[in-house]
């Protein structure tokens, strides 16, 4: 098998786990098809590439980081005499699959062009979004008003994660596809699907992404394209909703989810789904009681599991707070340094950077502040894939290298 074909096959296998994901078995926790495919994928690439996947500087660092996570997770389990053992084990697997996909993404970056990557992603995200209509057609217009109500909770890890993946499809449509009906139709389709999910994070994230990419674009073409496309999408969307039987329900739910805060019907606390309350509870009842070692090295990968207002939570719904509590302040500082480095590389390469990739970067990192999708067993691994691609895109001197994915 040729190396180039291996990379394409592996990427296709990885991405297709998104639309076709399901629970294989229940044991200590739910085992998803995507998790099995990630481990299988990794072993296949290691074998056929003769170890190229792991013999890289980035791979060595990533493996060391996971070993660091694992050591302090085991230490916390031993000190607590097995407390949260099941949760620590589950989230250790989630962290491991994130690391493995990062290693795979680092390998892909040498052999797959951005054109191939975007085509694969676009096709897979279409299939991913179609599944909600195929599996749960009678509930599509119920707008995910009840937690756990719709099928995307099973294969995507929740409504917000579903909206996140669909948002990536919109970014490809808007920034990568050439002018024409395909671009207009796909943009309109993805926006309508996001509105149906009522994911505020995904919708606001796209608005912020479009605005920041327009500012980032040194040629100034995105702003004019944004205004034109927005106008056509608004007109077409209005016509579709006007002649849709669900128009009234959509307008009512949209008003309640997105506009009620401005009318005073909803408080900021309610609009944020209680995120402020969760963080305050976490600080007052958990972080304040932490030892210096726990602050430095964390409480373990699966250490967040507590009740707030009678509801169970496995995340603070803020990735920065989660990393600090799970992995410690040292890892948090390292992660923030990595994000700052990526920002610096994007702006250093501004004239030649790909706007679609920058759109991914902005969107994923806005979402990570309000939606802890990284910790979803079904879809969180996608952050590892993009993190590897961002690192290869922004490496110094990447324009002179022949095998970098984004040349």
What kind of region is each of these model predictions?
Residues 1-50, 68-80, 364:
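N-terminal signal-anchor transmembrane segment
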Residues 2, 36-53, 167-176, 211, ...:
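Hydrophobic, aromatic-rich transmembrane alpha-helices
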Residues 39, 356-367, 374-407:
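Transmembrane alpha-helices of multi-pass inner-membrane enzymes
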Residues 51, 59-60, 180-182, 215, ...:
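Hydrophobic transmembrane alpha-helices and their immediate junctions
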Residues 115-142, 157-217:
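Alpha-helical transmembrane segments of multi-pass inner-membrane proteins
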Residues 141-142, 155, 266-327:
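Long extracytoplasmic/lumenal interhelical loops at the membrane interface
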